[in-house]
Amino acid sequence: MKACHVATERGIVLDGVLFQSGQQTDTIVIAITGIHGNFYSNPFYYNIGYTLNRSGIDFLYAQTNDAFDRMQTDNVVTGRKEWIGSWNERFAYTDEDIGAYIGYAEKAGYSHIILAGHSLGANKVIYYLAHNHDPRIAHFLLLSPADLDYMMSGVSGQEKRLIRRQVEQGYGNEMLPFPFMGWVSCIAYTAWDWLFSGLLNNVFTETDADFTQCSNITHTGALLIGTYDTFTDGDPTGFLQNINDHMPTACTEQAGLHRRDRT
């Protein structure tokens, strides 16, 4: 297990952790984290890494901009220190954040890359695959993607109006006067992305929702969710089945829908 540091196109350095099997392997699983899904808050990633290692597969725990609420990192373009986190993430960073980790794996010599994502990280993987038919990626793995419509249902109308007004008046980079969703301290632009951008709002409980991103994916892969998942409006299995139904590769032998009764 070793730390890895990956620079994005905008210069921000993201920190990940590489679990190496100790065997000669060309296969790696890159796991894109969800919000606050850092190496310290999710110890189950140790189990994933060590389990894959025992099968001769390397594992890269890939923290993105929102892995922590706030942390300091380097910007290799400006040469300065910067503060990043869930407090100022922009969803438009998704392509270059994921692309940086894929580039890291390719440069390290891996030719069989499985791109995984957990929670909001799964939504990011969907976004990336919908816009980048990247031949370096062999398959995808989506772990409990987040239903943003359900998550946003707890944001009051008054809070939505305040966020919209703050952005429209030119104060998007200012902190909100309240915790977004009740637990995220962030700037108005970040809350705007969650609520109004639609960039990562790509999975739904409704069968007739806009599944354009899912339908644009040409890779094959697998989906996994726990039946205790609380971000799916009460029906985790149906939620995952609905996503699978909108995947154009779902009928191929490589794709699959997997259910476990506990999480």
Where are these regions (language model features)?
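Mobile cap/lid helix-loop segments that gate and shape the active-site cleft of serine hydrolases
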Residues: 164-210
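Short beta-strand/loop motif that positions the catalytic acidic residue
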Residues: 217-218, 223-225
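Conserved alpha/beta-hydrolase "acid-adjacent" motif
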Residues: 230-239
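Short, surface-exposed "cap/lid" segments of acyl-processing enzymes
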Residues: 22-73
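N-terminal cap/lid segment of alpha/beta-hydrolase-fold proteins
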Residues: 1-23
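Catalytic histidine neighborhood in serine/cysteine hydrolases
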Residues: 244-263
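Primarily recognizes the serine-hydrolase "nucleophile elbow" in alpha/beta-hydrolase
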Residues: 103-168, 195-196
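Alpha/beta-hydrolase active-site loop
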Residues: 76-108
